[in-house]
A protein has these predicted regions:
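Bacterial N-terminal signal peptides
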Residues: 22-33
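Extracytoplasmic metal-acquisition and chelation regions
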Residues: 38-318
Length: 318
């Protein structure tokens, strides 16, 4: 940049008069482009959902780099040295929290040293506990299971709260962009409100006795709590937890007892026993849902993912 400015001064001083006007204009545009680029807020994200929200809120003022990408299993993901470098070169790091990123504490020294602002979605939502086998999420419960459910994005209300959190973080590091962030956030908030209404209109089509979700792992607790479903997960909170043979037998019995119509696979990882459970219970495959983050195609955005999941669930359980 310094070299460009020095050459410009020489041209402006008359050394190259024929080039003066054109080069001055070109140089000015280059300097403005470089300056504008320097103002872009670099955001690293450990959550595909939060990355999507960040793009909607930040627009052209932010550059979002996904450390955890669609299709990855975030339960077993570990950041590489290259990921550490990407994070340390960012202004903001987005994380789900509530134990979803088991390595997050190891990242904190890197964040503090580099001055990276950490935004943890789980800090602004009301966490629920992971489900016991056959646990009903349709109401509030006073007992605890000892582990919090980190899949807060399965509630649209929670996502609205986290979107506001991201907006506030952007304003804190880039006050000049406040108007842009507020405007984009308001537009997103309205869309999420419309999404929440749409979800409820779909769910009311299901008789309450049909609102039983058999899924690969316990990731739809917030969805179940919002819309009155019972969850029968094959695995626990994490995809790395393998069910015991006793749990599988108990689950088969519960599914048969409740007359469950469909069993749902997940987009990332499914336990081998899922096929066995489907065969022994006579329940049909209900389709694939996205539990741990976004996918591709129609599920490549948060709104698209929720619409896909809800449509899949309602069609299978009618």
């Amino acid at each position: 940049l310094r070299g460009i400015l020095q050459l410009t001064c020489r041209i402006a001083g008359g050394e190259f008069p024929l080039m003066r006007f054109g080069v001055l204009i070109t140089t000015l545009l280059a300097v403005l482009a470089i300056s504008a680029r320097a103002e872009v807020v670099r955001v690293a994200s450990l959550s595909t959902v939060m990355a999507d929200l960040a793009r909607d809120i930040g627009g052209e003022r932010v550059e979002v780099v996904e450390i955890v990408k669609p299709g990855m299993d975030p339960h077993i993901f570990e950041p590489s040295p290259g990921d550490y470098k990407t994070i340390s070169n960012s202004r903001i790091l987005l994380a789900s929290g509530l134990g979803f990123e088991g390595y997050l504490e190891k990242l904190r020294p890197v964040l503090e040293k580099s001055g990276v602002r950490l935004v943890v979605g789980g800090e602004v939502v009301q966490p629920i506990e992971g489900a016991c086998e056959g646990h009903d999420h349709s109401g509030d419960h006073g007992h605890h299971h000892g582990n919090q459910d980190p899949h807060w994005w399965q509630s649209v209300t929670n996502v609205q709260l986290v979107a506001h959190q991201i907006r506030n973080a952007f304003i804190a590091v880039d006050p000049e962009g406040r108007e842009t962030y507020m405007k984009n956030s308001a537009i997103l908030d309205e869309r999420l409100g419309d999404l929440a209404k749409w979800v409820r209109l779909q769910i009311v089509q299901l008789p309450k006795k049909n609102r039983v979700l058999v899924t690969s792992h316990d990731a739809l607790g917030y969805f179940a709590k919002d819309y009155g479903f019972e969850i029968l997960p094959v695995q626990g909170i994490s995809t790395s937890e393998q069910p015991s043979s006793q749990k599988v037998r108990d689950l088969i019995g519960r599914i048969q007892e409740r007359g469950v119509k469909a069993i749902f696979a997940e987009s990332i990882e499914n336990p081998k026993v899922l096929g066995q459970i489907t065969a022994e219970t006579g329940a049909k495959p209900g389709g694939v849902i996205y539990a741990d983050g976004l996918g591709s195609g129609e599920a490549g955005t948060y709104e698209g993912m929720m619409r896909h999941n809800v449509t899949t669930i309602v069609e299978a359980l009618k």
